[in-house]
Amino acid sequence: MAAMGKRIIVSGGDEVRVFAPPGRGVLEHIRLEGAGTLCACGEHVFCASNWGDMVWRLDAQKLVPTGLFAGGPDMRNMLISPDGERLMILCAEADSVLLLDAVCGAPMVLARAGVNPQHMSLDESGEVLAVAAGESGEVLLLSAQSLALLRRLPMPGIVLDVALRAGTVYALCLNETLNSTLVTIPRAGARQILSLSGMPGRITCERGDVICATEGFLHTVSMDGMRLLDTRRVSGRASIWLTVGETLLLCDALSECIFARNGGGQWSLFCEHARDMRFLFGKG
C-alpha cells in the first residue's frame, strides 16, 4: 500500500472514494449524494453536496461523517484556513464567498464576490484570499479573516481562475478569440499579458513555474509571466492535477474522468465519475 501522503480522495458519482496511485483499486468509499468539490486537511475531509446545498465533514482515516453543515448554491471551491478553524466556500450561484466555522459549521461571514465567481486561492500566509470573480472581469483580494475587500483588480475578460505566490497575482481569463490570457500582476512593476491556446481551465504555481490548464493543453510559464516554457497536449480541460511519483493524474472537467500519464508519456483512464480529487492528507 502507498504511504499515507500518497493516497488521494475522489468525489463524484454520488460517492467519495480513496485510492493509492498508481494502484486503481478503491481502498475506501462512502455514498454521498451530489458529492462535489473537496477540501482535505489533516484529520478531516470536507465534501460539498449539491443535494440540499450541504457540506459533509468526514473523518479522513475512516471516511465516516463527523459533521453536516449548511452551505450554499453551486459550491465551486472550498479552502481551509492554515489553523483549520475557518472554511471558505465559493458559491457561484449566490455570487458570494461564505465563511464557516470549520468545527461547528456556524456561518461567520457572507461576502459578495463578483458575478458567477469561478475559483479562489489563498496566499502562503493564509491571510489573503483571491477570488476569480467570473463575469465581472476582475480579481478580488479579500481578507481571509473577515472577507473584507482589500483590492479590486480589473482583468481583460471573464476570469476563470487565480493564484497567489509571493505577492504576485496570476489570473487566467477568457479572451475574445475563446482562448486564454494569463495576466500576471507583481507586487511592484507592470502587469504582464500572455496569450495561451485553449479555453481557460485552472492555474497553479509549482516547482518555480506557473502551470496553466486550458482545453487540450497544459502550459508551463515562467514565474514572471513573460515566457511560455513548455506546452503539453492533454485530454479535455483539467480542473485539477496531482503528481504521484512519475504518474500525473489529471481530472477532466468535461468528461468527469481522471486520466493518468505514466513516466513514458502514455495516457490511460484512471477512474470515471470524478468531479474533484485531493491528496488525502495535507491542505485542500
Language model feature labels by segment:
Residues 1-284:
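Predominantly soluble domains enriched in secretory-pathway, periplasmic, or organellar proteins
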